[in-house]
Amino acid sequence: MDNQAVVDLAIVVDATGSMGTFLSSLSESLQQIVQIIDITNVIQNINIIMYRDYCDSVITASSGWVSKIDDLIPFIRGLRASGGGDTPEAGKTAANNLLDVVKNNTIVIWYADAPPHHKSNARDNFAREINTLIGSDKIFDWIELCDTLAARNIIVYPIINRHHFDTSSFYVAMSTITGGKTLYLESTNEKIITQTTIKLLLSLMGCDNEFKSGVKELVYGSEFNRSSILDENNNAGYLPGTRSSILVNTVDLQVQTHPWLITNLRSLVSLFNADSHYKDKIFAVFKSLMKPTSVLSLTYNTIFATFWRLICRTYDDPRKEVLKEQMSVVLENLKKTNREDHVVVTEWISDSYNQTYEVNDIIKTKAVSKVPALVLDTTRFYLPQEILELSRTCNAKVLSTVVDMLSSIRLIEKEEDLPKTNEQELDSKGRPIPLKYIPLSLPNKYLFSILPHLIAPGSNFSLRPSMILATVAYITNNQILKDRAKNHLEYHKGKWIDQSLPENYTGGFINLMLRVPEFLTDEEISFFKFYQKVFGLLINGSTELDIDMPFTPYKKVCNDFKRECDHCHHIRSFTLLTIDDDGKYKCGLCHSPADDDTDTLNRVYTIISCDTPGETGMTISKDTTLGPSSKEHQDDYHSVYLECKSCLCHYALVNVDKMNVTPKCYGCRFDVYLPNVKCIICTNKYVDPAKIYSDNSETFVCPQCVSDPRSSIDILKVKFKDIYLQNKSTIHSLVGFEMPSDINVFGGHSIFSIKDKINILDHTENPTSLVFNRKFMLNAPIVIIEMLKWINSGSAEKGLCMICFNEFSKSNLRQICGRKVCQSVACYDCMKSWYGENKVGDLIHVNALTCPFCKQCPMFNILAAFNRQVCAMVRTNNSFDIDWWYGWCLKCFQPKKVVEKECSEDAPQLGGKFICEECSNVKPENSKECPNSLCKIPIIKDGGCNHMECTACKKHFCWLCANVSYETSEETYDHLYKIHGGAFEYDQDD
């Protein structure tokens, strides 16, 4: 408060039984109201006075004057609606109690729903109160009470929910005489009470607040003439009890600033930064109010949004993270339970980024001269939080926005050419209109902090984002700002990059900083280069590399070295030949019972020739074609080959049609040693039972390589993550650090979250070999070079979104349907747009239920990620008639026919409200339709009076008639008493 006298706040509350709903909401609201008022530092002391009536054990009670808000909370929580034997209450006693304790200028908020005792409503408690007050030398006359309040500098603002003259006239008289206003609430829910009271007090302080729906001001229908009133009984029609009454009307509420309370709330920003006790108070209030039921109280003035932004900027205070977590929980809760409030809070957070007050002040006070100045020549504008993404991610989209701004800057030399702004005008939220120029005479500190204000009005960067902005201006060679940017970067060299901040570990920021090493210290360069490699490793999991691998045959006709078996005289592959006791070649098929045990020999030639293991239960019959009589099905230079899945040796196959199990050579299947030889070109191994080539293995070239070396190589496209998983130690030695073993390296982790788990190696090595599927890559050196190129660049291979045809890092593309037969991929936004097109209550887009390319239903995990609700509809396997439009029913949650296409050329507009015919015909028992023609929702009455409020459209109506809707509860009660004689007449069906 700006050098004003002390001002106190008194809150007077009717706590009788009729205030049940009102007081229940009020007790919650008061806790929010007193905390919000406390952080304005305008009100010095607060006192809450509760009153009932003279038939109750407790007529009045008070919290006493307190300056510490925590001392009020127990009293507020103890407020209960009780007692009150007749309609009027002991309001005059409460007013006298107030007069007894007031010491300073006082603002009074008076909540009530009933009049004070008066001869027009006199019953038993009337006599009790008049006797008590007169006997105690107190004031009983209402008009005299109002005059005394005014004389004592007490201004009263009644807040009531009754429009009847018999009630409202007393409070209109009180507010008129004391200089206040009477506020009429159309609804007494917590939200309306809190919003109205806080906005009332903030308006008195000088904040521009618009009172929208839910509250009106009550005024006399003619000009108030105090001199015509003698007392409460001779009241000239301003109060009940006379033959003619002056009407009480409702008008739109407008509250002017009061000189007692006028203050500049913006000064509290500097207090937050300078006073630790005040900062503690702000944190405590935000923590208390950060709940779904009370967070709206923070949204009624932009100063509270500024406090939220200050809290979010406080990096070294653990309370910030607690509040941010609370806010996340609140937003998630409101998103599910109260969409309207969720929108309000989201907009409030958005407003918290707008610092137009501060920016305008910097331009006016820190600039030596207005010109030369920078202005923006563009039609594109952004929100402050959009441009502030520059501080968080430095991604391409945000950087392009900044470049767009810098390229649209113009230099103005003459003051008369500057954009004109009415500095006295305020926007819809009470903020000044932003100035649209930035003087170049501002010091660099301010120039680069408020420069984004041109494209995102209200933007005011802290040091870090302003340094990033200067970096972009320098890199893009902006002729107006390059020299200033260079000076700014040189001045802060080594002073602004805090390695404890998560934002400094993002890939975009790292890559940007390494473009200007001249403005980094040696330590910072080493820091960024190291984490650029870490980032490069993390993002390249989906990058594809071309690798050359030794070919893997499976029932494939290949070149072969063959020799004649000296027993059967068939030309056999060298992989099937053994040496008998006489030193002659003997193929596996020629082994006979005469040579060895029958079972063993059966297994020998069975395995070698057709790979069918005897132990699997498959037996060799006596009339089998296996054995020496088995003829070769290939010529003398070719055989059908397999690769053993255990030892990876190649071996030939004779009876191909008998092969029906996993390939395994004889040695691996029976765990015996079998000689083999390795090709010096393709590195494939071959079974060599007779050791024909094993003795000269250093010069062995396999038959496939002899014929055509290119045919012995399979060229594969393999994802980097598959190579990494099989060569971890090798790749770690190449890059110089080890990634943590307990995480999925390519699972989308941020660098900051794993940086403490990264083990930096003392030295790096230069291995030249890599394996894939247990075989050595033939082009390992080239693959290593390609891998390191991607890792060291801090960038990843891009792929094409097959829906929007934009390029994205492959790690940011997903399979559209998840089926192996469909390899189509798309970006997140396109996936969300495609599968998210169908919404409950709207027209069903049948195509969006399937993959846009293969036309199959997507896998559950894909669909659930982008539209979980639609999973149930897809699972029902509905067949859709192409001649019909279908809608998604709000009630049965099933696709239902809407109209034939031949009857409706254009798609029907369902507006999210589609209910199928079957569901529409089902109504709850004893229900009545809302009489609002635009609503018509079925409503059930479950006890209480006959005043009803539709929860859908908020209209009021009489349950007995249910044929007319009213705007207010007051109109409904007027109808009930006039037509039905009261609010509780029973319907014959009830």
UniProtKB/Swiss-Prot annotation:
InterPro entries attached to this UniProt entry: HMCN1-like_VWA (IPR056861), Multihaem_cyt_sf (IPR036280), Thr-specific_kinase-like (IPR052969), TRIAD_supradom (IPR044066), VWF_A (IPR002035), vWFA_dom_sf (IPR036465), Znf_RING (IPR001841)
Keyword line: Metal-binding, Repeat, Transferase, Ubl conjugation pathway, Zinc, Zinc-finger
Source domain of life: Viruses
Positions annotated as zinc finger (IBR-type): 855-903
Domain VWFA: start-end pairs: 8-201
Keyword Calcium carried by entry: no
Residues the record lists as binding Zn(2+) 1: 801, 804, 827, 830
Region span, TRIAD supradomain: 797-990
Residues reported in the UniProt entry to bind Zn(2+) 2: 930, 935, 950, 953
GO molecular function, one term: protein serine/threonine kinase activity
ZnF (RING-type) intervals: 801-854, 930-961
Residues at the active site: 945
Name of this protein: Putative ariadne-like RING finger protein R811
Organism: Acanthamoeba polyphaga mimivirus (APMV)
